[in-house]
Amino acid sequence: MSAESGPGTRLRNLPVMGDGLETSQMSTTQAQAQPQPANAASTNPPPPETSNPNKPKRQTNQLQYLLRVVLKTLWKHQFAWPFQQPVDAVKLNLPDYYKIIKTPMDMGTIKKRLENNYYWNAQECIQDFNTMFTNCYIYNKPGDDIVLMAEALEKLFLQKINELPTEETEIMIVQAKGRGRGRKETGTAKPGVSTVPNTTQASTPPQTQTPQPNPPPVQATPHPFPAVTPDLIVQTPVMTVVPPQPLQTPPPVPPQPQPPPAPAPQPVQSHPPIIAATPQPVKTKKGVKRKADTTTPTTIDPIHEPPSLPPEPKTTKLGQRRESSRPVKPPKKDVPDSQQHPAPEKSSKVSEQLKCCSGILKEMFAKKHAAYAWPFYKPVDVEALGLHDYCDIIKHPMDMSTIKSKLEAREYRDAQEFGADVRLMFSNCYKYNPPDHEVVAMARKLQDVFEMRFAKMPDEPEEPVVAVSSPAVPPPTKVVAPPSSSDSSSDSSSDSDSSTDDSEEERAQRLAELQEQLKAVHEQLAALSQPQQNKPKKKEKDKKEKKKEKHKRKEEVEENKKSKAKEPPPKKTKKNNSSNSNVSKKEPAPMKSKPPPTYESEEEDKCKPMSYEEKRQLSLDINKLPGEKLGRVVHIIQSREPSLKNSNPDEIEIDFETLKPSTLRELERYVTSCLRKKRKPQAEKVDVIAGSSKMKGFSSSESESSSESSSSDSEDSETEMAPKSKKKGHPGREQKKHHHHHHQQMQQAPAPVPQQPPPPPQQPPPPPPPQQQQQPPPPPPPPSMPQQAAPAMKSSPPPFIATQVPVLEPQLPGSVFDPIGHFTQPILHLPQPELPPHLPQPPEHSTPPHLNQHAVVSPPALHNALPQQPSRPSNRAAALPPKPARPPAVSPALTQTPLLPQPPMAQPPQVLLEDEEPPAPPLTSMQMQLYLQQLQKVQPPTPLLPSVKVQSQPPPPLPPPPHPSVQQQLQQQPPPPPPPQPQPPPQQQHQPPPRPVHLQPMQFSTHIQQPPPPQGQQPPHPPPGQQPPPPQPAKPQQVIQHHHSPRHHKSDPYSTGHLREAPSPLMIHSPQMSQFQSLTHQSPPQQNVQPKKQELRAASVVQPQPLVVVKEEKIHSPIIRSEPFSPSLRPEPPKHPESIKAPVHLPQRPEMKPVDVGRPVIRPPEQNAPPPGAPDKDKQKQEPKTPVAPKKDLKIKNMGSWASLVQKHPTTPSSTAKSSSDSFEQFRRAAREKEEREKALKAQAEHAEKEKERLRQERMRSREDEDALEQARRAHEEARRRQEQQQQQRQEQQQQQQQQAAAVAAAATPQAQSSQPQSMLDQQRELARKREQERRRREAMAATIDMNFQSDLLSIFEENLF
């Protein structure tokens, strides 16, 4: 490839030119004479001219594109190294190259010409590229490696040319002047040299290209690379002249990557060609890739012998010259070039790339490469191996330990010198050993490793303005010098020595001048670099990128988990200034990076690498930042990361693993500074809320969550309340944390919460006070809720509770974004303490937040399906069901108590009805999934019972009759646990029997509001057994139960379905239906109704929502009073809840009645809570298990019929209060009628629901492990059989459950109730086990489910149930 030869030729020409520039005409004459001898046999012709002072300069958009895009792309290609310098016919032993190739050309020459505005139009440049490729094809055989490399480059070249701007327009050469000094100097320096080279150059470039085929074995490259250094030195003198500097400046930047490759092909190093090498070393950096070398090492082996050039004096001069050339382009280059003054700068500049070099060397020493790297670890032991001729053949031995020691001693100025020594080591091996020797094969393997890593080394910035770019330039100088001496043969060494001697004096003078120039350039660069750092463009881009940044940051958080990849050299200069103040934690050095890259290297050294946890937290914090701050984040990254500098901020994709530690630390500082500002106001808000509520549990949870999120949570809630940005990335995690905190608080505070309930609503546990506070301002709490939800549970819960029924509604919508905060705030204040008793409930607890969120969104669905009033209750029910889900018996009572005590409750119920309706529907879908997951996790029987009880309350929403049944459940539930039983009676005492009945229905409806849609879906749970036990509230509740019985029957089938939870929705629905029928028959007894309701509640906490809506309509007033809710009774101090509830209920009961008459209000469910305090405990126990299954079955299809029934019976609640028996009768009748209607509706709706549930289940299955899917395919047939068997088993279970429910109803006495919880727990455990088994089977069969077969099975099963 002529390109390869090009670099070599260029090096020689440069020395010649350098000599002439130095003002030693003799040197130029010698150079000219040398080229001729090269042509004759031993010398290379001068390189093609790259600048002509007599020729007008011109810059066009196409030429600019060729330099910045086409040439830059080709230069970085792994096959480009042979074409980066003129062909060194001497070094490669190609005496006939320049005889065959009359017009040599290489990319190094083209690059210089483009940088010097040598071309008049783009066509001339394209012609040079074509000449380079043609020379390679002419001189080399078609199958040679070099030809294949040239073809690959040509293909890429043609692809880039297709994108060339169509119209060529001239551009002012202002920038050229900026680089100008060096360029002008180069032009002046080269004029004399160029005149001679012009004639020879034509021949030389072709020669350069052709030899490349031979050099392809990079083995020789190490030596040639050193040769490059001498070339740089020669150019340095040129730089002193002034014209040379410009020339060097442009080449050094591209050459940096290439220097290693360039030297390899440059046998010319024996000549002053070292000069040519300078630009190439810089360029070669990327171009030199070992892959190319490995392909042709055998051909180069003989050629690489010359790399051992004796003239090391050249290297010293060359190093100085190269320094001068570098200063011309970037200040950093200048500093390294002047070894005396710039030496310190050099070390800092080189640091980034030399760090990479150190990493490459470490990898080469790694054990994984030891099998083929061991021969290169130490110097060749000539005596031990008996290699007496080794020193004669290998003039410059090299080994990895020597390279390591030089690297540690900072003897390498840049990566190019390092690469030259490594390649010298390999070339020595190829040169001394025969091609088929095993050591050669080992060298090629190791060189492949080296070249791959070396090619990936981050490029030094090529922009002259940026100081960072300079580091790349100096490295080549060092590397070039040693290789040049080794590469040049002994014959050429004498010539080069003479030329170097002549120019040494001049070099010393030039060095002084260059150092002064470097100082001036550095000052200019510093001035330029600062504006770049503050460039507004990047800020604007950053602003645009803000949105994308948020989403990408989230992805990055996941990516951060991956092991850290190489970090590109830091580009801190631009962003450091702006980001330093903001990012206090990131890196102290970022500010330094601004002015010079050297600081960056130091900073990089000082920077502590980020741990995975730190990166994850950083990504979370970045997601919290508002949009206006993200722009700055992008700016910081772009300014510090060369690879992302030119990326489009709107589409930037950032992988934390690829970012430098300094960049990450700078980001950390900035984000921390931004978040601190936000946190202060947020903290104030939290304090205000905490002070008002003074909730210990919430405060503890808040502190925990804040600590966990590292203050990111508070910021998120505060700043992103409006933007909702935190909700996207951080919220999920924060919410989880909050849930954990709530669970912990509930576990720790279960006793305290009961204690708090003793104080009436005003003094409930810390959570209750917030509720009270929020009650007066129901509207404000909703807004505060979202803010405080994530950061501090304290503040958010009080608003929810304070709102009571009305507040709950606004909060629910607000909580859609902050599900956890809202859920815990309104409902969980008391429930949280309850959760601890039942460990499995935490899953439910987490579920409630989601339910609440969904409730906020889904209430519209409830509105559509049910009357507005019922839907509102369901909304509230959505909030309440989380309480049952949590085993906090005391907390529910407390929460309800505060709500009940307030007289506004009567009015709030209406508000709640309106506001809460929308929330309920969403809860159903989310709750279904959450409960299913929780059920699996929380299989403990105890949790299941409580959950069932809680859910049993929701079932009442089905038809108006269910409200009485809900009351029965509440009363009956207390009996199942011995302690709860006493609680219901005190509540009844406080409240007249009729009123308690109303209150209980209200509470149930509140809880059931979520379940109503699931009624059809709710699977029967053992809870029915427990539900019947509560006999104490028998009188008032009996009436309600009679009405509810029909619904309870329905709910039972649903609970059965839940047991099946794993099976398709249809199966769940059908069992529910069957249970409803059986329950309907059994419903006349209160006990039957209660078990069914409990099942419903347990089966689907979410489903209860629709049920609650229906119930509430019928029992408007009672439901409104349901605030106390059964969960509160569960707590250890049921007496307190009862007392609190009783006073609250007494004053509010009248209010409740009017609300009921006016419209069905949802608040009554809260009133129900006080009597069911005891039952709540059981329910909570059951809930954990059942809630999981119920989630799937949350559907509102039956809501329409329920709503109609509710509307018909809105007045029944008041009548119930007057005559509990009459109201129960009415409810039972309505329930029975609804059951009949619902059966027809269910037949139709269940088909759609089954399909929907199937889709849900399929989605869940698709998420299951792939292994399970593979197994599923194998066991597809078995799975079908299992399903059939399971369906039969479920049917049997449903029948058994129905029987159990009847038995429980029969055992209305407290003894029966106490015995029921155990049987219920056993049943629930069995159900949970079966569900888990079914879930696993479904997972296994997920990929092979036959939907037609499934539908048939479901239809058959449904028929059997009904």
Swiss-Prot record:
Post-translational modification note: Phosphorylation by CK2 disrupt the intramolecular binding between the bromo domain 2 and the NPS region and promotes binding between the NPS and the BID regions, leading to activate the protein and promote binding to acetylated histones. In absence of phosphorylation, BRD4 does not localize to p53/TP53 target gene promoters, phosphorylation promoting recruitment to p53/TP53 target promoters.
One BP term from GO: positive regulation of G2/M transition of mitotic cell cycle
Annotated ranges, domain Bromo: 58-164, 348-457
GO molecular function, one term: transcription coactivator activity
Annotated Gene3D superfamilies: 1.20.1270.220, Bromodomain-like (1.20.920.10)
UniProt KW Zinc keyword: no
Region (Disordered) residue spans: 1-58, 174-229, 242-352, 463-615, 674-1100, 1116-1339
Bias type Low complexity, positions: 23-43, 197-211, 478-497, 699-712, 926-936, 1211-1223, 1285-1313
Ranges annotated as biased composition (Polar residues): 1071-1091
Region described as NPS region: spans on this chain: 484-503
Clinical condition linked: Cornelia de Lange syndrome 6: A form of Cornelia de Lange syndrome, a clinically heterogeneous developmental disorder associated with malformations affecting multiple systems. It is characterized by facial dysmorphisms, abnormal hands and feet, growth delay, cognitive retardation, hirsutism, gastroesophageal dysfunction and cardiac, ophthalmologic and genitourinary anomalies. CDLS6 inheritance is autosomal dominant.
Protein name: Bromodomain-containing protein 4
Organism: Homo sapiens (Human)
The organism's taxonomic lineage, starting at the top: Eukaryota, Metazoa, Chordata, Craniata, Vertebrata
